[in-house]
Amino acid sequence: MKDHIEKYDFSAAISPIEEIVEEARNGRMYILVDAEDRENEGDLIIPAQFATPAQVNFMAKHGRGLICLAVTRDRAKLLELDMMARENRESMKTAFTVSIEAKEGVTTGISAHDRAHTIAVAIDPTKVADDIVSPGHVFPLVAREGGVLVRAGHTEASVDISRLAGLYPAAVICEIMNDDGSMARLPELVTFAQLHGMKIGTIADLIAWRRRHDRFLERRIESDFESAWGGKFRATVFRNTLDGAEHDAARHQETRERRDGVQPHQDRGGIHDLLEVVEHDQHAPAFERPRDALFESGFAVVADAE
């Protein structure tokens, strides 16, 4: 049996991210698996707006892990959720806040109905901090801004999927455990998914998908200037939305029609030094070769790749 499991091609059981997003959009529960060198676990996930008592009960009965609510930093801030620990020393840096309960509409708070109601209140745009209390039986997790491109965890992945599906950016997640209490790995997760008619996706595939399709740079400032080296340029400052870093680019107006391309520039002197915008440029000799290459090849753009 072990040899059969080792030879089985589990990649055939993995669904493309587009299918996982479609499952989420239609309110169906799915499974996401993280990397083997990380937690190497699979989580049951459903967009928070579809978390009915039946779905919560399924997670408690079949998932057996901790049922958590993944939310954005903005939502956690609006609900005034304090972090569970002042210093997060957990190995994966999972961002737990204090546990919560709906202020009204619950009894003991632990039933599937009560937890589903608490989740509904926590993601309701009309509700505020006064509508929840702590401690409770729902455990919020705060997703990092930038999602899986910043942290490759189930928290970020579940919020990313909800957002890609055009839904409220929150999700209910629960680790999947085996009958004996051990964590389910991919072979067991495939069996679990087949038994319950679910699709499995991977966080690695989600990261790859976002890298292919997302736009990370936003245009901040543009201005035209004359270069002492020759010609007119248009300088643009871009901001990386993932880490906030700014990058410079300059387009040579006169070579624009010759050949469209990008010449990366990594010297700390910056774009203005390269093009000798500042008089008596002390760095000019260091830029002689890349600058020559820029004009001789007809490249239209020089970018600060620092």
Regions picked out by a protein language model, each given a short descriptive name:
Residues 1-250, 256:
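Catalytic domains of riboflavin
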Residues 278, 290, 298-305:
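Short, intrinsically disordered low-complexity segments enriched in Ser/Thr with adjacent Pro
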Residues 206, 270, 276-277, 300-301:
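Generic short N-terminal amphipathic or hydrophobic helices
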Residues 255-275, 287-295:
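Hydrophobic, low-acid, alpha-helix-prone terminal segments
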Residues 279-284:
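N-terminal helix-forming leader/targeting segments
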Residues 55, 225, 293-295, 302:
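Short, intrinsically disordered/low-complexity patches at protein termini
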